[in-house]
Amino acid sequence: MTDNLNFTMKFDLDKDKEKKAREIIFTVYQSLEEKGYNPTNQFVGYILSGDPTYITSHNNARSLIRQIERDELLEELLKSYLNTK
């Protein structure tokens, strides 16, 4: 068990999951905007709490966001952020 502390675990998403996550993020973002919410605040609330009620059910966004894990969501958001800087 202590030997495992000397190694770094690798987290990797396959390309299909990345594409699906990206599409879901854009769809959910657009749905939140359409309903008048601040999408950034709503995503942060969802990521921190895991509570899907931060995401509107408009356009089935709440069901969509639950198709991807929060760590996958965070990974896509971070990649996008770093690629724009």
UniProtKB/Swiss-Prot annotation:
Protein's name in the database: UPF0297 protein Clos_1665
Organism expressing this protein natively: Alkaliphilus oremlandii (strain OhILAs) (Clostridium oremlandii (strain OhILAs))
Pfam families with a match to the protein in the record: IreB
Domain of life of the native organism: Bacteria
Family: Belongs to the UPF0297 family.
